[in-house]
């Protein structure tokens, strides 16, 4: 953890991670993953930087660790590339965390995920590409790229009943608030048609 904290002092480091639990691939033990996850949470708490959280097929254990660690002291975190269930998203929101969605939310069979996105407060949501993976419709199966994030934004804006421009403005504000080490003079909400 000391090395993570030391490296985080570099001016270009704006977050800790990605760290978390991945039970889809069984490359390391659950115990080892939990230990590493907790160390990253401690580093995020110590530095004040947001933690990018990876949670795949591990909602229950992720929620438990987040709740236990948050009880020890708050920290900023983003549930990156969110595809989990409603319970983990609700618990993250209750701890003032951000839930970030990718192109998966645009897929035909992702109605439950769109429902989760609709339930996340507007001031606690982000969109991302996770490029080169998870391209949104109509580019599913192709290499993802930053320009495609607008399709994810459009899908979530639609389920929230707001314009894409309103959604872009909100997510830009959320990004600036959470990633406060990023020079903000260059950030303007933009929707490219």
Which sequence ranges carry the predicted segments?
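Short, surface-exposed amphipathic charged segments that create phosphate/polyanion-binding patches used
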Residues: 1-2, 193
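Divalent metal-binding pocket/active-site signature
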Residues: 2-95, 107-108, 115-116, 120, ...
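Short hydrophobic/aromatic-enriched beta-strand-loop microsegments
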Residues: 75-78, 98-103, 187
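Conserved beta/loop motifs at nucleotide-recognition and modification sites
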Residues: 130
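Mid-to-C-terminal alpha-helical segments outside catalytic/metal-binding sites
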Residues: 147-193
């Amino acid at each position: 953890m000391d090395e993570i904290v030391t490296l985080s002092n570099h001016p270009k480091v704006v977050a800790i991670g990605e760290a978390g639990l991945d039970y889809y691939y069984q490359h390391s033990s659950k115990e080892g993953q939990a230990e590493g996850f907790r160390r990253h949470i401690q580093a995020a708490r110590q530095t004040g930087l947001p933690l990018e959280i990876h949670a795949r097929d591990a909602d229950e254990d992720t929620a438990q660790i987040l709740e236990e660690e948050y009880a020890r002291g708050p920290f900023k975190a983003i549930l990156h590339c969110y595809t989990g269930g409603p319970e983990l998203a609700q618990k993250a929101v209750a701890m003032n965390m951000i839930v970030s969605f990718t192109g998966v939310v645009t897929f035909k069979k992702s109605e439950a995920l769109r429902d989760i996105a609709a339930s996340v407060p507007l001031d606690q949501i982000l969109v991302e590409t996770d490029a080169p993976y998870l391209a949104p419709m109509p580019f599913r199966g192709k290499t993802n790229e930053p320009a495609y994030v607008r399709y994810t934004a459009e899908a979530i804006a639609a389920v929230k009943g707001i314009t894409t421009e309103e959604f872009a403005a909100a997510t830009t504000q959320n990004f600036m608030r959470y990633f406060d080490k990023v020079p903000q003079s260059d950030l303007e909400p933009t929707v490219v048609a």
